[in-house]
Amino acid sequence: MKCLYILSGHTDRIYSTIYDHERKRCISASMDTTIRIWDLENIRNNGECSYATNSASPCAKILGAMYTLRGHRALVGLLGLSDKFLVSASVDGSIRCWDANTYFLKHFFDHTQLNTITALHVSDEVLVSGSEGLLNIYDLNSGLLVRSDTLSGADNVWNVSFKDNTLVAAVERDKRNLLEILDFS
């Protein structure tokens, strides 16, 4: 194992990371309310590059972020990535869909009346989010909420996966952890 870079910029804990294989970028989300993106193929595209001195780290290069995405008002805990979209979800109940190439904001979903978003699935067409007993399905072509369902009796939705009208949800019911398979056809 060899350390290649230290990616700097966040000012608080980092809660989610993604390596974008297609674009050769590292993406992270933090308690500091930001999403940061580093270009690992062309390091000159990033912010300041410095060299570690007198450091216990085996890495020599410290890279500043190429992009910093802002807009969430609280900890950003979840990230999702498709070919077209980078999606971020915050404990403030908001979801932001960014263009995966330009990082311009494409869609904003504000559900501040809900509790923290705990599950996220994104494809080029559909976004599914879950929180305490609630599933929301969005059409990412139109930016509209197309379905909102309460999972009766579910205390939490921990993870979701959606394909071809079938949703797999990891839920908690009465202190039991279960997988539920739901058909949306």
Swiss-Prot record:
Keyword Transmembrane: no
Database matches in Pfam families: WD40
PROSITE patterns found in the cross-reference section: WD_REPEATS_1, WD_REPEATS_2, WD_REPEATS_REGION
PANTHER family with a match to the protein in the record: F-BOX AND WD REPEAT DOMAIN CONTAINING 7 (PTHR19848:SF8), WD40 REPEAT PROTEIN (PTHR19848)
WD repeat extents: 9-48, 71-108, 111-148
SMART domains, alphabetized: WD40
Alphabetically ordered keywords of this record: Repeat, Transcription, Transcription regulation, WD repeat
Gene it is expressed from: RRT13
Domain of life: Eukaryota
Organism encoding this protein: Saccharomyces cerevisiae (strain ATCC 204508 / S288c)
Name of the molecule in the record: Regulator of rDNA transcription protein 13
